[in-house]
Amino acid sequence: IFVNKAKFVETDEQFILPEPLSDPIIEKLVKRRTAETYEVKAGEYIQIIDPGGRQCSDFLAFDTHKLKDGIESIIDDKATRTFMGSAYPGPGLFSKFYDSDHAAMVEVVRDTVGRHDTFNLACTAKYYEDMGYMGHINCTDNFNKGLKKYDINSRKSWSAINLFFNTAIDANNVATFDEPWSRPGDYVLFKALKD
């Protein structure tokens, strides 16, 4: 079997965003292989859009008040799965992402895809090196660079929420990965529950 993949050519047309759900306070286009940081207050909304379809986006959230006290508290995938009773939250009753102190950080208000990943780390240098791609740009290094301005310690890996990443556990208890389900313009809308 031979598989021919199309070459990705980045053009401005691929990054035309759909109309926002409300007037944006901040609008950022995160180009592939990069990371952006931004601050929100409790009660504000975060809309993460896949403008091109079949892309993935790693998401971290910190509690600003804990950061001021020197505590780097981020979304905890294990706590979230435990409290929600599912692989990842969705709109409705079981809609929150929690930190390791069991505090709700963000709530899923709307999700047009319905398939994400809370089992895997954000991609790392080791992940790519093990596949033979030395020096490959990776999410962990991008996070480390972007978070320096907040005096957040660098890590070898980040336990991020991998939005639009199509991960499942099969009948043999094996993690499977497949093409993302997201189409151009699909999004997840979060409500911040912490600054």
Language model features: what each stretch is:
Residues I1-D195:
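Acidic, Ser/Thr/Pro
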